Amino acid sequence: MHSSIVLAIVLFVAIASASKTRELCMKSLEHAKVGTSKEAKQDGIDLYKHMFEHYPAMKKYFKHRENYTPADVQKDPFFIKQGQNILLACHVLCATYDDRETFDAYVGELMARHERDHVKIPNDVWNHFWEHFIEFLGSKTTLDEPTKHAWQEIGKEFSHEISHHGRHSVRDHCMNSLEYIAIGDKEHQKQNGIDLYKHMFEHYPHMRKAFKGRENFTKEDVQKDAFFVKQGHKILLALRMLCSSYDDEPTFDYFVDALMDRHIKDDIHLPQEQWHEFWKLFAEYLNEKSHQHLTEAEKHAWSTIGEDFAHEADKHAKAEKDHHEGEHKEEHH
């Protein structure tokens, strides 16, 4: 009973806070209008003029307009429509903030729209957008600290949701591409795993040293060795698990750590650069298996997984190093 009361109070406070955030931000948007009036159109143009002047790094996302000045933005009809689009998005995000389900769904739709238009904007750029937007509003009206904080809160939740959406999208693209390297007991499925090692031994011969007793193998030797049937299945299964868990960040990170621990247990100590290099190898192999039919979105998705895998592997290596150094110091005390 007590826990139910506490939960109800927490929920009430959260809803009240979201409603207050919405109220403050909606009030400030009176100075960044949407509509067909001349004033509203100019508000949208002014947002992009401010962006192009103070955040020039964002210009590269506007093809053929990368070298625009604020004066160029003012004269280009493109920014009349685009300005209203971006202000409308800000209005909707603000208006739905106290309805989290709708807010999250709208963020997802915005991300999907950018994907359909082949506009790839890194998450950190989205984060910077909210700094820019708050500065822009501050140039149109006086923003008090509670209002600035309210917009920062919306920006933070927006960033959280795009991170969640982004991981879903990466997972979906990678899962689609795995049709080219199915795993199982059929001969062609076993061959998929063997082919990965054949590619490795042919094009990345320095990686052979991790395979004791097989350091001088050719790709023909790999084909004939039953070891690579089992090993090929293992590595393709691991890749599938990394892909399927990618939208669950804690599970993905834990699985990477488990893979690192397994290699250490088996006395396989790969240089960190080889973990990074593996993803280049895998991209080549997968593109070859797809007969060069991988989409750019699929290639980008695997690159993203590779970067996050390598980042987590680096963290694991540092933790291991710190642990061993700590043990070494204790031995000498």
Swiss-Prot record:
Entries under InterPro entries matching the protein: Globin, Globin-like_OT, Globin-like_sf, Globin/Proto, Mb-like_M
DNA damage in keyword set: no
Domain Globin: 25-167, 174-318
Annotated signal sequence range: 1-18
Cellular localisation: Secreted, Extracellular space
Matching SUPFAM superfamilies: Globin-like
Alphabetical UniProt keywords: Glycoprotein, Heme, Iron, Metal-binding, Oxygen transport, Repeat, Secreted, Signal, Transport
Region (Disordered): 314-333
Top-level division of the source organism's lineage: Eukaryota
A Pfam family of this chain: Globin
Sites carrying sugar chains: 216
Sites where the protein binds heme b: 82, 114, 231, 263
GO MF entry, a single one: heme binding
GO cellular component, one term: extracellular region
Primary location recorded for the protein, binned into one broad class: secreted
Record's keyword annotation contains Amino-acid biosynthesis: no
Subunit field text: Homooctamer.
Domain notes: Consist of two tandemly linked globin-like sequences which probably each bind a heme group and a C-terminal extension which may act as a cement between the eight subunits.
Similarity comment: family membership: Belongs to the globin family.
Protein's name in the database: Extracellular globin
Organism of this sequence: Pseudoterranova decipiens (Sealworm)
Taxonomy of the source species: Eukaryota, Metazoa, Ecdysozoa, Nematoda, Chromadorea
